[in-house]
Amino acid sequence: MMKWVLFIPELYYLLMAVVFFACSLSRRLQSGVLYRWAVILAGGGLLATVLAVNQNGFIFFDCYRVDLYSQLFKILLALGTFWVIFSCSELQGIDSRYHAEFFLLTTVCTLGMMMLVSANELLTVYVSIELSSYSLYLLVPMRKQTEIYVETGIKYFMIGVTASAFMLFGISFIFGVAHTTYVPDLVKTLPSLIKEPAAIIGLVLTLCGFFFKQALFPFHSWAPDVYMGAANQVTTYIATASKMAAAAMVIRFVNLSGGESPLFTQVLVGLAVLSMTFGNLVAIIQKDLKRLLAYSSIAHAGYMMIGILTMSEHGVASAIYYSAAYLVMNFACFMVIMKVADDGRNLQIKELAGLHKRSPLLAMTLMLGLFGLAGIPPTVGFTGKFLVFAAALRKGYLILVIIGMINATISLYYYLIVIKAAYLLEPERPYPDVRVDTWTRALSYGLIVLMIYLGVFPDQFVALTEAAARSLP
């Protein structure tokens, strides 16, 4: 008998998707009613995922592995999805005809990413990543004035399909070398074969698909255009929840090499350095806040890679911690964008002028989120960078850590430009007051507390990430 209890979170999101599909068939359902049901269902999904955290086992002929590592990332996915849906009380940037489809595709994408982090076999990985990717391809062009932004959707689709083709090609190389597609078998056989060119090529090509999702240089070209072209709500989802699944799979697949190939490690070091440097330098000249955060995400993919490439328990744990920290910090910034640009427009940095007067709470949330991304204590971002750099130092990557610290210093410049606009600049013209309802206030206070608490008292969560790292095969 199959252990269906191991599949409870995924079954819940599958049923949730069916509900939204039924809602999409009826055009009489008001957006307010749809939103309330979406929040309730997303909250239920988060609860179901948290309750399933201690489940362990294999299902679907061992193609699906449930352990603490996968369950922790599922909680991050469910949390990110809940936050995004909770903050979507007004879907101003999305065509009113597609509000039900927005919730449907968001749910299906979350389902695909949950399947991805538990996938224990390469073809299951491929099917899962395609399920999540095609949902995102459809979400991006849903913005109002689609004729203007349809180019963004097409570009995202074409680059994504190319990345998927590379990944499938890499899987064929791995199968040809190792004669298996099961991850536990690859863990045993691939380290001894990793010095063979075919094995290295296969692993690198497979990782290309995940690097694309993570926006790691040079697989980043879609990110700035998609962040700008998609509706604010869709961009928030792409920048937060979808990055969790990519991080989970990069960690899992990098560890397949077992650290036996110096060439493979050097490639990862190069990608980390290029991502940090390119992302931070190009972010300096940005005027659009979403585009700035897009280049920031490229840099943060590089920071995360520092922990991953150590291929140690501490390195993996630090990368997991950094992923969770990034989810909280990035969502805080994008929530402010959604609330300030409540008509669905893209937000220029100069439009934040005087935000501390129009909405002191949102200004504080944005400031702490940016301080965290910059790695300033006592925020969760500082602790995340400290753990990542410490793990790299333990493995002797001193030069890499120095480069990372230099890049973190560079990032201070453009993050402080945004904070300066919110707190020190006077608006060039009168901007409307920012409407902050009770639920937004509660969410803002919660994010502020979380960003500081996890930064000052990280011990419990660090212990959880270390336990998750130990559960990896």
Swiss-Prot record:
| Predominant location category | membrane
Subunit structure, per the record?
NDH-1 is composed of 14 different subunits. Subunits NuoA, H, J, K, L, M, N constitute the membrane sector of the complex.
**InterPro entries xref list:** NADH-Q_OxRdtase_suN/2, ND/Mrp_TM
Do you know which HAMAP family this protein is assigned to?
NDH1_NuoN_1
Its name, as the record gives it, is: NADH-quinone oxidoreductase subunit N 1
* One Pfam family from the record: Proton_antipo_M
Q: Which reaction does it catalyse?
A: a quinone + NADH + 5 H(+)(in) = a quinol + NAD(+) + 4 H(+)(out)
Topology in the membrane?
A: Multi-pass membrane protein
UniProt function note:
NDH-1 shuttles electrons from NADH, via FMN and iron-sulfur (Fe-S) centers, to quinones in the respiratory chain. The immediate electron acceptor for the enzyme in this species is believed to be ubiquinone. Couples the redox reaction to proton translocation (for every two electrons transferred, four hydrogen ions are translocated across the cytoplasmic membrane), and thus conserves the redox energy in a proton gradient.
Q: Where are the transmembrane segments?
A: 5-25, 33-53, 66-86, 102-122, 157-177, 199-219, 226-248, 265-285, 292-312, 318-338, 362-382, 399-419, 445-465
User: Which Enzyme Commission number(s) are on file for it?
Assistant: 7.1.1.-
Q: Does the keyword Cell membrane apply?
A: yes
GO function terms (MF aspect): NADH dehydrogenase (ubiquinone) activity; NADH:ubiquinone reductase (non-electrogenic) activity; quinone binding
Organism listed in the record = Syntrophobacter fumaroxidans (strain DSM 10017 / MPOB)
Q: Which GO terms describe its cellular component?
A: plasma membrane
